[in-house]
Amino acid sequence: MKKLGTDLLKRGFAKMVKHGVVMDVTNVEQALIAEEAGATAVMALERVPADIRVQGGVARMSDPEMILEIKDAVSIPVMAKARIGHYVEAQVLESIGVDMVDESEVLTPADEVNHIDKRAFTAPFVCGARNLGEALRRIDEGAAMIRTKGEAGTGNVVEAVKHMRAVNEGIARVIGYKEMGLEAELIQMARNELKVPMELISEVAELKRLPVVNFAAGGIATPADAALMMQMGCDGVFVGSGIFKSGNPAVRAKAIVEATYNFDKPEVIAEVSKNLGEAMVGINIDEIPEEMLLAKRGI
C-alpha cells in the first residue's frame, strides 16, 4: 500500500525553502544559473508564463524527460507544474521524483470545478490564492504551501500585492473576531464566506497567519518587487518570466535573491538594483482581455 506523506512532513519541506527565491527555468543552463545565483529551488517548465501568454493554446505539464534532466543537473529542489484538477499529471510528476508539485493556474485547467485531492499524494503541493478563502480551501485539500496568484507573465506586481493584501485583511478579521470573542461570527465566516472547516479558522486565529508557508508569485520582476512582497509578510518569492526575460538574467537573479534576504534594508536593495540591464517588458493588467486573465482560474 502506498504510504502517503503527512501534512507535517509536507509542510516541513515547504519551510526548507522559506526566505528564499524559487525561479522558473526551462533548461539545464537556466537551472545552473538559478542555482549559482542562490535560488532555494527551481520550477522546471517548458515555457515561462510570458511565453504561454503570448503563444496561447493549451498549456500542459512539461515533458518528464526535461524535468529529469534539470533534476540531474542541480542539487537544489526541483518543482514542476500540473494543471488544476489534473491528478494524473500530478501522479506522473510524483513518480519521477519532483520535490513539489505546483497545481497551477498558469497551465490550462483540466477541471473547472475540482482541484486535485492533494492528501492522496506523498509529494507536497503548492497552490495559488487571491484571498484567505482560496488559501484555506487549498490547505484543506492538502496544500503544503500557498503563493499569491498575481498575474503571471506580466512583469507587473500589482495583482500579487492585491492578493497578499486580501489574505492579510482576511487574517486580521479572523484575529479580530477571536479577540472580541465573536465565535458566532467566526463560525459564519468559516461556513458561509470562506467555506472551510472551523478548525482551520481556529488555527489561523492562534497562529495569526496562514498555517503553511506563503510565498509571493506573479509579476515579480525587480529586487524592489521581491522586497515589497517580503515586507508585506510573504515567506519568500517565486520569480517566473522576470529573470530569464530580462537583459541580464544571471545578475538579476542574484540581485533578487539578495533583495529577498535583505528585504528590510533599503541600502542593500539600492546597491543590488544598480546596473541590472533591461527588465522584462511589462504588461498593464487593464490591457489584458478578461478571458486571458490567469488568476481567475481555480477558486
Curated annotation (Swiss-Prot):
Q: Does the keyword Membrane apply?
A: no
Can the keyword Nucleotide-binding be found in this entry's annotation? Answer: no
Name listed for the protein in its UniProt record: Pyridoxal 5'-phosphate synthase subunit PdxS
Pathway entry: Cofactor biosynthesis; pyridoxal 5'-phosphate biosynthesis
Q: Where does D-ribose 5-phosphate bind?
A: D24, G153, G219, G240, S241
Q: What is its EC number?
A: 4.3.3.6
Function recorded in the entry: Catalyzes the formation of pyridoxal 5'-phosphate from ribose 5-phosphate (RBP), glyceraldehyde 3-phosphate (G3P) and ammonia. The ammonia is provided by the PdxT subunit. Can also use ribulose 5-phosphate and dihydroxyacetone phosphate as substrates, resulting from enzyme-catalyzed isomerization of RBP and G3P, respectively.
Give the UniProt family note. Belongs to the PdxS/SNZ family.
Q: Which gene encodes it?
A: pdxS
Enumerate the residues binding D-glyceraldehyde 3-phosphate. Answer: R165
Which NCBIfam families does this UniProt record tie to the protein?
PRK04180.1, pyridoxal 5'-phosphate synthase lyase subunit PdxS
Q: Which CDD domains match?
A: pdxS
In the record, biological process GO terms are: amino acid metabolic process; pyridoxal phosphate biosynthetic process; pyridoxine biosynthetic process
Q: How does it assemble?
A: In the presence of PdxT, forms a dodecamer of heterodimers.
